[in-house]
């Protein structure tokens, strides 16, 4: 109190309510400490019970003979003695002896996974076959990358390879091949040619037949003898240029077509037609009249 009788605000006043709050806080702290002590006692009792259970397991498993060494034990075959010994040292959850739980092994496993990702074949990811250096048709890779002189030609219509169809001649361009030449049979992993190529032989046979027909006298090709009056002769035949021989062929092309039809319809094996003798066709009745 000052001279005027008013209380002094600078000095703390003794309030009974503040002391009651402190007492309450102290009581609460004591209660929490007591609860923690009870929990510790219960944990100690649980530890004692666990030790008793471990000792019973040791007694039950004492008759078994384990052939494994302590170094070879795993989590599935760990004996109860080792767990009981380590329960007091590092706790029952101490896994320090397990080597596969270390960080080094885990990092190695991640490195192994990345190695698998890196070591996968990357042929499909590389540039396409057309853009790789040194890439070419298969027939150029048969002799160690050297160009093959008898590689497949684009003009060959009888080749069954993919290159011939993909890079074939443009429409309107006729295949130019010198008569009498024959392709050499080639074998490759992807390119297979048919061994029997009869196009050249047929071309040679037709050319020789045309030459022989030019030298022989033209004979009329009639299947039957004229029984009635003779019919007027047909219109004059226009000479046309043969695509094979390059010279004009007269009326001799009519028996040539007849012989070609009979040749294709007959059942004969593949042989060299240049060795066959071409005889003119004569009707049976005409032969009989000639004899008379």
UniProtKB/Swiss-Prot annotation:
Coiled-coil positions: 23-63
Compositional bias per record (Polar residues), positions renumbered to this chain: 263-285
Residue numbers spanned by region Disordered: 1-25, 122-186, 198-292
Keywords, sorted A to Z: Coiled coil, Synapse
Keyword Nucleotide-binding tagged: no
Regions of compositional bias (Acidic residues) in chain numbering: 198-214
Primary location group: other
GO biological process, one term: inhibitory postsynaptic potential
Highest taxon of the lineage: Eukaryota
GO cellular component assignments: postsynaptic density
Cellular localisation: Postsynaptic density
Assembly notes: Interacts with GPHN.
Family statement: Belongs to the INSYN1 family.
Function: Component of the protein machinery at the inhibitory synapses, probably acting as a scaffold. Inhibitory synapses dampen neuronal activity through postsynaptic hyperpolarization. This synaptic inhibition is fundamental for the functioning of the central nervous system, shaping and orchestrating the flow of information through neuronal networks to generate a precise neural code.
Protein name in UniProt: Inhibitory synaptic factor 1
Organism of this sequence: Bos taurus (Bovine)
